[in-house]
């Protein structure tokens, strides 16, 4: 039950997110018009904005709402925390924020937020249109695939965001690429029942009954109240009725073990981190190089490049 409640919060619920964001903005207006109750109202505004993100982290306006409140409160450490959280969902290294510690977040914090969302939209349809029209400053499909192979998707929110992105890749006809990327995401977070379900449906359309059954079986083990495995078996049995061929039987224990071994092997591969020894001199040189580049980008106002330093 606890796991079910946690998953409910991790899956976007747009209506609740929009409701809390609207409530947060109302409290912000009250705070700006009544100085005597400013702290009370702005406190409620911040709490509501946090709830908006909690219920729907895929709505960019929810992030903007909380960031605006952090600016009003002059809570720049809090703004950094918001950006770190967003970067985690976008599959980017939160330590990139630490590399920007010299940035004046009072002046450039909101611009950095917009730059991150402009380059990596949370809406999967917007992201897919952007990939298809990729220019020099926008990530291509090849770049996205390369990035997926080296990022950590253990954050369930990142797993959901990227899972919906690769669904757009599947819908465009790249089925083999979808399977590869889906297995990578599931290796990071096997509890993503939505992605298991989509993978099972794809295998079913490809007439790969064993693989489809294994995926549906995993979904039903994660969500016992669903009947996707049983429904699939009923559909499969219905197709077999009246045919001379031998009826389909469930995958053998060996087949199931092979499937699980593949996922374990992939999980080990994606979680392996190479230990690289870096000399003190090279660290200082890299830090100095970043500082020089940071100053140039700030002078040019190039915020899109800032998030990739």
Please annotate each region the language model reported.
Residues 60-72, 202:
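Non-membrane alpha-helical segments in proteins
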Residues 307-309:
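Conserved small/polar residues in nucleotide/adenosyl-binding loops
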């Amino acid at each position: 039950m606890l796991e079910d409640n946690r998953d409910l919060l991790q899956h976007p619920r747009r209506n609740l997110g929009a409701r809390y964001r609207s409530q947060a903005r109302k409290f912000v207006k009250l705070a700006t018009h009544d100085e005597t109750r400013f702290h009370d109202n702005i406190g409620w505004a911040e709490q509501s904005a946090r709830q908006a993100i909690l219920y729907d982290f895929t709505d960019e306006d929810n992030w903007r709402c909380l960031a605006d409140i952090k600016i009003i409160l002059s809570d720049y450490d809090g703004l950094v925390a918001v950006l770190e959280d967003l970067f985690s969902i976008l599959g980017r290294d939160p330590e990139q924020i630490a590399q920007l510690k010299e940035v004046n977040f009072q002046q450039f914090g909101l611009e950095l937020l917009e730059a991150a969302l402009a380059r990596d939209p949370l809406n999967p349809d917007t992201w897919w249109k952007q990939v298809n029209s990729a220019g020099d400053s926008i990530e291509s499909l090849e770049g996205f695939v390369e990035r997926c192979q080296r990022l950590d998707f253990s954050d369930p929110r990142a797993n959901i965001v990227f899972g919906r992105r690769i669904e757009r890749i599947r819908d465009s006809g790249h089925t083999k690429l979808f399977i590869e990327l889906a297995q990578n995401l599931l290796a990071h977070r096997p509890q993503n029942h939505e992605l298991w379900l989509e993978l099972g449906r794809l295998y079913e359309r490809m007439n790969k009954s064993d693989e489809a059954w294994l995926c549906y079986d995993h979904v039903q083990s994660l969500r016992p109240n669903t009947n996707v495995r049983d429904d699939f078996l009923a559909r499969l049995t219905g197709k077999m009725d009246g045919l001379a061929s031998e009826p389909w039987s469930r995958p053998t224990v060996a087949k199931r073990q092979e499937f699980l071994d593949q996922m374990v092997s992939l999980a080990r591969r994606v979680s392996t981190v190479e230990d690289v020894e870096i000399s003190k001199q090279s660290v200082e040189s890299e830090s100095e190089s970043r500082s020089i580049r940071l100053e140039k980008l700030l002078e040019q106002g190039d915020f899109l490049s800032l998030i990739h330093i």
